[in-house]
Every structure is written in structure tokens, then in C-alpha cells.
Amino acid sequence: MKEKISNNIQIKNKRATFDYELLDTFTAGIVLTGTEIKSIRLGKASLVDTFCIVEKGELWVKNMYIAEYFYGTYNNHNARRDRKLLLTKKELRKIEGAVRASGFTIVPTRLFINEKGLAKVVVAIARGKKEYDKRDSIRERDDRREMDRAFKR
């Protein structure tokens, strides 16, 4: 039951771009166990309903799903445990200052494996969209598609 391991892992949080207005992005390292990185390399992770918090000067990602590794034994990881993100102090201060301002949150938008084989998470400072903003986004996207179709003819 050996599964194909891809070198081009890109796990995206498509829901974040719909629910939030993304303002500023940062690329962060993530602290993982051995079975977690193996599951990510197999593409068995999800960023849906994931969020970040700043706690004691550290950034933590909460509710991120990484499936248990199929070949893992008794030392397999918990699928939804909290994971620490690695950023510079300057980036952490900037994020912490933005989160203290009302209405802002930190949302992971993408999980990928870089060229060195390390897992990285792209987090964004975001502001929640209202229902009418979401409808406007859908309307703009549909209009863009119709214009593209018209130009192709």
C-alpha cells in the first residue's frame, strides 16, 4: 500500500480567501513530528477551519488537520494538535500588533514543502468579510468569467 510521494505539495485554504479580506502575508516554518511531515508529503492535510493565535510571544496554529500516518505505530501524532509556527521577532511583533487592533485575525492560507524539503505555512493578517462582501466577490468573479468568455469568441 505504498503511496506516491509528490515533491510539489501545495495545500490551500480556499475558504480563507472567501471568508476574509487578506491584508499582509508571512511565510513561517512549522514544528512537526516525523509522522506529521510524512503525512504532509503524502498530501493528507487540511487547512479548513484553521486559525492562529499569539500566546506568550509565540505564534500557534490551532485546529490544523494532519491525518495520522498509515505506517505510524504507537508513536503516531494527534491529528488536530496545536503546532508552533516559527517567525522572526520582527514579524511576530508586527502580527501581534495587528491582532490587537480590533477585527483582525491570523489565518493560514497555504501549506507547502520548499525546495529544501521543509514544511512552510503562509499566514495572512485578515479582516472578516460581511455577507454582502462575499456576494460582491462572487458577482465580480462571475463577471470576470463572462468577460473572458466573450473575449475568447
Curated annotation (Swiss-Prot):
- Which InterPro entries did the record assign? SmpB, SsrA-bd_prot, SsrA-bd_prot_CS
Gene3D superfamilies named in the record: 2.40.280.10
Tell me a Gene Ontology molecular-function term this record carries.
RNA binding
Q: Look up the record and report any one GO term of the cellular component aspect.
A: cytosol
Q: Name one Pfam family in it.
A: SmpB
- The ranges of region (Disordered) come to 131-153
The record's subcellular locations are: Cytoplasm
UniProt GO BP? trans-translation
Report the principal subcellular site: cytoplasm
Which keywords does this chain's UniProt record carry? Cytoplasm, RNA-binding
Protein's UniProt keywords contain RNA-binding = yes
Keyword Cell cycle: yes or no? no
Instruction: Show the NCBIfam families listed in the entry.
Output: PRK05422.1, smpB
Functional note:
Required for rescue of stalled ribosomes mediated by trans-translation. Binds to transfer-messenger RNA (tmRNA), required for stable association of tmRNA with ribosomes. tmRNA and SmpB together mimic tRNA shape, replacing the anticodon stem-loop with SmpB. tmRNA is encoded by the ssrA gene; the 2 termini fold to resemble tRNA(Ala) and it encodes a 'tag peptide', a short internal open reading frame. During trans-translation Ala-aminoacylated tmRNA acts like a tRNA, entering the A-site of stalled ribosomes, displacing the stalled mRNA.
Q: What family is this protein classified in?
A: Belongs to the SmpB family.
Stated name of the protein: SsrA-binding protein
What organism does the UniProt record list as the source?
A: Parabacteroides distasonis (strain ATCC 8503 / DSM 20701 / CIP 104284 / JCM 5825 / NCTC 11152)
